Amino acid sequence: DVYARLTERQLRSRLESDAGVLVAESEKVVRVAIREGLEPLSLLLEERQLETQADLVRDVLALPRGGEVRASAGHVSVESCEGVPIYVLPHDQICKLVGYNVTRGVLCAMRRPLERSAGEVLDGLPDVRRIAVLEGVTDATNVGAAMRSAAALGIDAVLLTPTCCDPLVRRAVRVSMGTVFQVP
């Protein structure tokens, strides 16, 4: 359901926790998210990526909830060992599952971090000098690009007004290259 049938709104309020679920796409974004403390719930890999992403799979398996990948009947399936399930499918099946052709070969469902107020963000930063405010930016691509630019420019925090697109939707996360998890 997480990769196929649920809308971004449904993911946000998913049963997993009070915080919901987000989907990170690409090895780089998944690695940044894990490094920033997000909890993976499952990993979906293209079959052709299994060998090249072996380090990522090992890293996910090494996490406290890690699972186990097993090959069977000419394709790879998953066994969850009280951990993170890792699903491996051919490219065409992943495209059919997620509903679009661009997947970068790696998708990871992750527990969504709790939203913080502007006060909570600013109180958590000891030496804030540069703050960007996004107001009324409703396109996920633009929000992701703004987050990526903010990181490149050394902005200390980015505040989004309620009229902005959710910065944790799949497209915004992908375009930000994971910086949405790094810049408060």
Label the predicted regions.
Residues D1-V60, C164-C165:
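Boundary-proximal intrinsically disordered activation/regulatory segments immediately upstream
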Residues R12-D18, V78-C81, D156-L159:
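N-terminal start-of-chain detector that recognizes signal peptides
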Residues V2-R5, K96, G136:
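Residue-level recognition of specific faces of alpha-helices
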Residues T7, E46, S80, R116-V121:
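Short, solvent-exposed coil/turn linker segments
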Residues Q53-G66, A73-E79:
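Short, aromatic/basic amphipathic alpha-helical patches
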